[in-house]
Amino acid sequence: MIISAASDYRAAAQARLPPFLFHYIDGGAYAEHTLRRNVSDLADVALRQRVLRNMSDLRLSTELFGETLAMPVALGPVGLTGMYARRGEVQAARAAAARGIPFTLSTVSVCPIEEVAPAIERPMWFQLYVLKDRGFMRNALERAKAAGVTTLVFTVDMPTPGARYRDAHSGMSGPNASLRRMLQAVTHPRWAWDVGVLGKPHDLGNISAYRGNPTGLQDYIGWLGANFDPSIAWKDLEWIREFWTGPMVIKGILDPEDARDAVRFGADGIVVSNHGGRQLDGVLSSARALPAIADAVKGELKILADSGIRSGLDVVRMLALGADAVLLGRAFVYALAADGQAGVENLLTLIEKEMRVAMTLTGTHSIAQISADALSRVTREQANAVSP
């Protein structure tokens, strides 16, 4: 298969993966309206082309939370990444390090903190959920700190899980799910050998290390569902802010007032995110929510964005809408599933090339120069229209 864009990696991943895994990463909540709008709203953001600007010198590097990034991109937290390629979190982390950007390990990763952190030279980031089991949260924070994790990404938009109807049809959940997954694995022998056999163990490494016994895929949904905490409030995060001395980023912000609360709380950054359309269907896409949030808190903390980013052009669009950097999710998992570490490295190379073209043709020499001026007037008016 010819790979020229992230969309090609999606097709390659679909061909290689058992359906339950492909649809788990590809799908969203309920009717998936927000999932689709994340992509379409971002694609509708029109860039402002400029010419004759002497664009011989482009600088894509940026500073974020005391780190130098080769470009304003990080690999975001994705649960079960280790099911998409053999020890997938390690491969993805190595790809990110090779391209000079951060990797964020999910709470519900297959590979534990202690396996991923030593595999790369640059410090990684760690994502943590708000869970009823505060003992697990403290244990995970202590282990992350001991492993040299620099930045904590705290996900707050899952006090309860959104319903993902596609999972019941694909075999991730629903009747006879274990049997259906086994039959799917048999019909996908390349994945079954590379991941199913050589990629063991298949437990949730960070959770198993705390519980003292394997927490496998069959326990994944049940354990998480029992531990999400709908009672969480800002005051419940204060002990974490006191314990974690490094940068702390609040992930799951879609409203300007919540962004202001994050500033008052003392967060170092936020991620404008609807969880990739996997939580509450019908909310604003990240691209539509971002401008008003940037107007409210720009300069008071770092603003990251995710959901719907599929190309280097999308990265530039998000920066022009007000983000300081972006997180990649589905896009890098598709590439990982298709071709492991090499696939992720190639995806990041494609994104960098696309960013260079977009910056050259919008007349922006550096990341700091990418602003609303890089957007067409029509796009700026549309962005203002959704501001509260």
Swiss-Prot record:
GO aspect biological process, one term: aerobic respiration
Membrane topology category: Peripheral membrane protein
Signal sequence annotation: none
Catalytic activity: (S)-lactate + A = pyruvate + AH2
Record Pfam families: FMN_dh
Keywords: Cell inner membrane, Cell membrane, Flavoprotein, FMN, Membrane, Oxidoreductase
Matches recorded under PROSITE patterns: FMN_HYDROXY_ACID_DH_1, FMN_HYDROXY_ACID_DH_2
Amino-acid positions noted as binding FMN in the UniProt annotation, renumbered to this chain: 106, 127, 155, 251, 306-330
GO cellular component terms, semicolon-separated: plasma membrane
Function summary: Catalyzes the conversion of L-lactate to pyruvate. Is coupled to the respiratory chain.
Protein name per the record: L-lactate dehydrogenase
Protein species of origin: Xanthomonas oryzae pv. oryzae (strain KACC10331 / KXO85)
